[in-house]
């Protein structure tokens, strides 16, 4: 009897375990499918946004043409052809400066903006376009190795969702055709499938680069090199802008990390509700800088206005300054505003490996120090804010860097009364918050006995629950949460919005140091 009961009990345990495992597996699969659907929805949303932008452009152009035809038809039907011709020749409409204003020599040849060489199937409608400019190098070319690194680290389905455009910035057609021949031999399958395209500009695209003004202490040769480089970037961007949702600028002497494509795409989709302009996946120069396709027209136009004046990375920073910086505010305020348009992903996904520069005689031992670093902080886009703390910072791991996604915050032993303050530049409607302390190298350096508090813009007539009202402090802040096991997260009572500031308050002395490696103050999305 005991044996039978034991057998029944064993069977019940087995059945229960099996059902539990089956339920968990089903739940986990369902969760993964939901995440996948959410990503696909965000991707579709981005495609629709880009399509809407392009349709709007085409609609405006077509409307202008239709109006001209209607007017011409009406005038002709009234037997006023001569009068119409006189009007057209005597009256000139106001003109907005175009590419021909900045590069007037292009008017001398109607093919100046058409690739002299174009290899590939012309794939469009992808998520990411990767642009790689390359020129003749005196010592060694790294192009083949770069392409192998990019292509070999793509999964089959990813190869269908991107296009790699190699821009050969040379007008010597013999050299261009020799590069094309090498690429066709090495990557014939990728070219025929549409994954890889190769283009080169016509000789008439370039202006006279012999009499450029020497600036910033650069030699005449370097000024010519950087000026031509700006023009190369512009041609490549103009060619790429109609092909996909995002455009990422690469170089011909890099290697990449595994799973780079999926990482880039998911990071961009996570930020789809934010008004970013540049996502950075490398800290070096122009490598790994990604734009949204509709923004490329603005980038190209700005570069062409100043292509002879400054290098590309300086010009990019000027674009951001023009867009968001207030001349009446200080540099810190400007940096905070720019940080919302220029968002850095860490660790870097691209590493520079070229030793010999495309500039003749230049040796450059540039490497991205973040390429092999473990991820010690998690990056989010937070509302622009002035940050401050009473805590003693350790070795330059400042709160400002953490809030801007550059580094984790590390402070020496917190004591009762210490605080961390985030004062928003403008009041913000906040949906939720997340603060995570400690990291994988120092998991014990966490915030303990610390509360989360918010300061509403309006302290009176708040439509909030009695429970929330009871958490009001003497200085007008409301205590809405606390750290548990090093983490504080929660939903903000909508009645408290808009919020002027967040504050983390230490209420008891701590026995350990504190690291803050994740800050996410999530705005309400419209």
UniProtKB/Swiss-Prot annotation:
GO cellular component assignments: endoplasmic reticulum; endoplasmic reticulum-Golgi intermediate compartment; extracellular region; Golgi membrane; Golgi stack; peroxisome
Coiled coil: 28-63
Topology with respect to the bilayer: Single-pass type II membrane protein
Location(s), subcellular: Golgi apparatus membrane
Purpose: Glycosyltransferase that catalyze the transfer of GlcNAc from UDP-GlcNAc to the GlcNAcbeta1-2Manalpha1-3 arm of the core structure of N-linked glycans through a beta1-4 linkage and participates in the production of tri- and tetra-antennary N-linked sugar chains. Involved in glucose transport by mediating SLC2A2/GLUT2 glycosylation, thereby controlling cell-surface expression of SLC2A2 in pancreatic beta cells.
EC supergroup of this enzyme: transferase
MF terms in GO: acetylglucosaminyltransferase activity; alanine-glyoxylate transaminase activity; alpha-1,3-mannosylglycoprotein 4-beta-N-acetylglucosaminyltransferase activity; glycosyltransferase activity; metal ion binding; protein homodimerization activity
The protein's name in its UniProt record: Alpha-1,3-mannosyl-glycoprotein 4-beta-N-acetylglucosaminyltransferase A
């Amino acid at each position: 009897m005991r044996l039978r009961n034991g057998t029944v009990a064993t069977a019940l345990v087995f059945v229960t375990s099996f059902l539990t495992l089956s339920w968990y597996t089903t739940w986990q699969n369902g969760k993964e499918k939901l995440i996948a659907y959410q990503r696909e929805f965000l991707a579709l949303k981005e495609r629709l946004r880009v399509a809407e932008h392009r349709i709007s452009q085409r609609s405006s152009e077509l409307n202008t043409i239709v109006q001209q035809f209607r007017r011409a038809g009406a005038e002709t039907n009234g037997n006023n052809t001569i009068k119409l011709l006189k009007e057209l020749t005597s009256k000139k409409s106001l003109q907005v400066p175009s590419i021909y204003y900045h590069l007037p020599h292009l008017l001398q040849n109607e093919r100046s903006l058409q690739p002299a060489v174009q290899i590939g199937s012309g794939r469009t409608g992808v998520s990411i376009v990767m642009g790689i400019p390359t020129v003749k190098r005196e010592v060694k070319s790294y192009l083949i190795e770069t392409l192998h690194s990019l292509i070999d680290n793509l999964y089959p389905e990813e190869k269908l969702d991107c296009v790699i455009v190699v821009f050969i910035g040379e007008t010597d057609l013999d050299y261009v055709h020799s590069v094309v021949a090498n690429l066709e031999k090495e990557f014939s399958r990728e070219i025929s499938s549409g994954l890889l395209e190769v283009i080169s500009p016509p000789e008439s695209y370039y202006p006279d680069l012999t009499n450029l003004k020497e600036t910033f202490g650069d030699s005449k040769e370097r000024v010519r090199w950087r000026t031509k480089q700006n023009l190369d970037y512009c041609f490549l961007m103009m060619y790429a802008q109609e092909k996909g949702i995002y455009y990422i600028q690469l170089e011909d002497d890099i290697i990449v990390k595994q799973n780079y494509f999926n990482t880039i795409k998911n990071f961009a989709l996570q930020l789809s509700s934010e008004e970013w302009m540049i996502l950075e996946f490398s800290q070096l120069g122009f490598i790994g800088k990604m734009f949204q396709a509709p923004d490329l027209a603005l980038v190209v136009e700005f570069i062409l206005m100043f292509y002879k004046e400054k290098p590309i990375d300086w010009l990019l920073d000027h674009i951001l300054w023009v867009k968001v910086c207030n001349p009446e505010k200080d540099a810190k305020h400007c940096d905070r505003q720019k940080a919302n348009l220029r968002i850095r992903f860490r660790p870097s996904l691209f590493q520079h490996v070229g030793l010999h520069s495309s500039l003749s005689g230049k040796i450059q031992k540039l490497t991205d120090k973040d390429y092999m670093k473990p991820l010690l902080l998690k990056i989010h886009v937070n509302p622009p804010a002035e940050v401050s703390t009473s805590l003693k910072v350790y070795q330059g791991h400042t709160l400002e860097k953490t809030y801007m996604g550059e580094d984790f915050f590390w402070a020496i032993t917190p004591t009762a009364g210490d605080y961390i303050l985030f004062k928003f530049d403008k009041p913000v409607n906040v949906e939720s918050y997340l603060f995570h302390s400690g990291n994988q190298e120092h998991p014990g350096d966490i915030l303990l006995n610390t509360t989360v508090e918010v300061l509403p813009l309006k302290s009176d007539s708040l439509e909030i629950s009695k429970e929330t009202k009871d958490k009001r402090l003497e200085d007008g802040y409301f205590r809405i949460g606390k750290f548990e096991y090093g983490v504080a997260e929660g939903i903000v009572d909508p009645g408290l919005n808009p919020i002027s500031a967040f504050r983390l308050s230490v209420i008891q002395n701590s026995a350990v140091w504190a690291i803050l490696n994740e800050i996410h103050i999530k705005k309400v999305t419209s």
